[in-house]
């Protein structure tokens, strides 16, 4: 799935992703697949796996999409 980061609080380590008309999807820093400091910025486009937990929708295996222009 592909969505857009609505907001992410680096100090608290979590935020939310917007995907189509679904409710906001929770994302925790531990679900971000990248080396180094795991954070996201508002407006980042990300690919992720969606799971449903007792607390609602949650993103897993989150990766930033690198867009290229020609």
Q: Which residues does each predicted region cover?
A:
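S1/OB-fold single-stranded RNA-binding interface
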Residues: 2-31, 36, 61
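OB-fold/S1-family single-stranded nucleic acid-binding modules
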Residues: 51-70
């Amino acid at each position: 799935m592909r969505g857009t980061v609505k907001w992410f609080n680096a100090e608290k380590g979590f935020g939310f992703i917007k995907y189509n008309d679904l409710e906001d999807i929770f994302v925790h820093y531990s679900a971000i697949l990248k080396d180094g400091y795991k954070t996201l910025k508002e407006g980042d486009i990300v690919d992720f796996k969606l799971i449903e937990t007792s607390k609602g929708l949650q993103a897993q295996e989150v990766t930033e999409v690198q867009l290229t222009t020609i």
